[in-house]
Amino acid sequence: MKVHKESTGLLVSMATLFTGICLSLFYFLGASIVSYLVMIIAIFLYLLTINFFRCPKRHSPFANDDRAVVAPADGKIVAIEEVSENEILHERCIQVSIFMSIFNVHANWFPCEGKVTHVSHKNGHFIAAYLPKSSTDNERSAIVIKTEKGARILARQIAGALARRIVTYAEVGDICSVDAHMGFIKFGSRVDVYLPLGSQVEVKMDQKTVGNQTLIARLPE
């Protein structure tokens, strides 16, 4: 399993900082309990960060299925409801939300096959991502995908209390695949998917999801 490219700068900075601290402690304090304790803590934090930025290579069993909508992220289903999406789509939709804890893979996949027709970013707050109001109040990025049959799917990356940086790779005009990454969110967050009414939801509340693998819905025929 490789480490995500978004980790490069942070891991280099952490390695430099931790190495400097440990060398200084061993120089001034020698091989003391404090020196070894700090070194162990530094190694633990570094390995924890590597684990957070892990980036598994996956191939979806639903690639090329024009009705399939897959989970864009690892996590847990925290909302399934009919809502009015008034910010971008301006229509009634089915919202399926996935909460990502700091222990989940934080790469985000495209939820369906199609063409990107809209990408935007909006500043906001950083309240806990598992709360419903995070969908409308938090900093977020939005990606709209139009399928071959004309359905519009909105995927919204939402920052959380710890996740204060959203990275979006999608650009308007991109032809997207469920096997491709649409972005990355650092340190705990949420992804909302807005589906056309009439879509058949295939997940339940509190169900665990695997990005790119779990079928969350089938679009209307």
Curated annotation (Swiss-Prot):
Belongs to the phosphatidylserine decarboxylase family. PSD-A subfamily. GO terms for molecular function: phosphatidylserine decarboxylase activity. Catalyzes the formation of phosphatidylethanolamine (PtdEtn) from phosphatidylserine (PtdSer). It catalyses: a 1,2-diacyl-sn-glycero-3-phospho-L-serine + H(+) = a 1,2-diacyl-sn-glycero-3-phosphoethanolamine + CO2. Its main location: membrane. One of its GO terms (biological process) is phosphatidylethanolamine biosynthetic process. PANTHER family: ARCHAETIDYLSERINE DECARBOXYLASE PROENZYME-RELATED. The record marks G188, S189 as: Cleavage (non-hydrolytic). GO terms for cellular component: plasma membrane. The active site is at S189 (schiff-base intermediate with substrate). This is Phosphatidylserine decarboxylase proenzyme. It is a peripheral membrane protein. Heterodimer of a large membrane-associated beta subunit and a small pyruvoyl-containing alpha subunit. The modification Pyruvic acid (Ser) is found at S189. Keywords: Cell membrane, Decarboxylase, Lipid biosynthesis, Lipid metabolism, Lyase, Membrane, Phospholipid biosynthesis, Phospholipid metabolism, Pyruvate, Zymogen. Its cofactor is pyruvate. It holds the Pfam family PS_Dcarbxylase. Is synthesized initially as an inactive proenzyme. Formation of the active enzyme involves a self-maturation process in which the active site pyruvoyl group is generated from an internal serine residue via an autocatalytic post-translational modification. Two non-identical subunits are generated from the proenzyme in this reaction, and the pyruvate is formed at the N-terminus of the alpha chain, which is derived from the carboxyl end of the proenzyme.
